[in-house]
Every structure is written in structure tokens, then in C-alpha cells.
């Protein structure tokens, strides 16, 4: 089994597709095997009563990766020879990601 290095972009994309692609490009340049994002919806990650009480948590909506980015990011990663992954944080995300990801990380 070969060792693989996967760059964790997480939520650092700033909801900006070019910034996301820049992370992918940098991952390729430093020799990573793959790149991983996260797909979550803040209203499914936290209970409604938590969201109602905590403005700083509601602001995390800005950390959501737009689902519309996934096909383009996957294609770009593959064009650079990288595997593409995105951790699903809600059940439907698995179906949404399936056509685009090479692997899932489960923690």
C-alpha cells in the first residue's frame, strides 16, 4: 500500500471558486496525491435552538461550500492528476458527491 498525502482545504475556500482552485493547484505543486473539501449545511450541523442563540455559529453559513462548485473542482483536480474528495456532513451529501469523489474520509 502506498502512502498518500491529501491536502485538507476544509472550509478555507471563502465561497470563492478561484480560491478553491488555487488550493488545488498548490496541492498539486507540493506533491499531494489528493485534495479534500467539506460539504455541510450549517442548519443540518447544529440544532435550531443552538442556531437561534449563537450568532457566531450562524455566521458559519459563510463556511459552506456551494454544491455547484463540486463538479468543476473535481474536474480541475483530476486534470492535475489529483484525487478529489469531499467529506459529507449530512446524509444526502453522499448522493450529491458520489459522481465526483474518488474516496470518502470517515472520522
What are the roles of these predicted feature ranges?
Residues 8, 27, 97:
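Conserved, mostly hydrophobic/aromatic
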Residues 33-65:
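Glycine-rich, proline-tolerant flexible connector loops at the mouths of alpha/beta enzymes
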Amino acid at each position: 500500500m502506498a502512502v498518500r498525502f491529501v491536502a485538507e482545504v476544509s472550509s478555507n475556500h471563502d465561497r470563492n471558486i478561484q480560491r478553491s482552485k488555487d488550493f488545488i493547484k498548490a496541492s498539486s505543486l507540493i506533491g499531494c496525491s489528493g485534495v479534500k473539501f467539506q460539504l455541510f449545511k450549517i442548519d443540518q450541523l447544529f440544532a435550531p435552538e443552538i442556531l437561534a442563540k449563537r450568532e457566531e455559529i450562524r455566521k458559519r453559513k459563510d463556511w459552506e461550500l456551494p454544491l455547484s462548485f463540486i463538479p468543476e473542482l473535481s474536474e480541475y483536480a483530476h486534470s492535475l492528476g489529483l484525487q478529489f474528495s469531499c467529506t459529507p456532513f449530512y446524509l444526502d451529501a453522499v448522493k450529491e458527491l458520489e459522481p465526483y469523489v474518488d474516496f470518502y474520509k470517515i472520522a
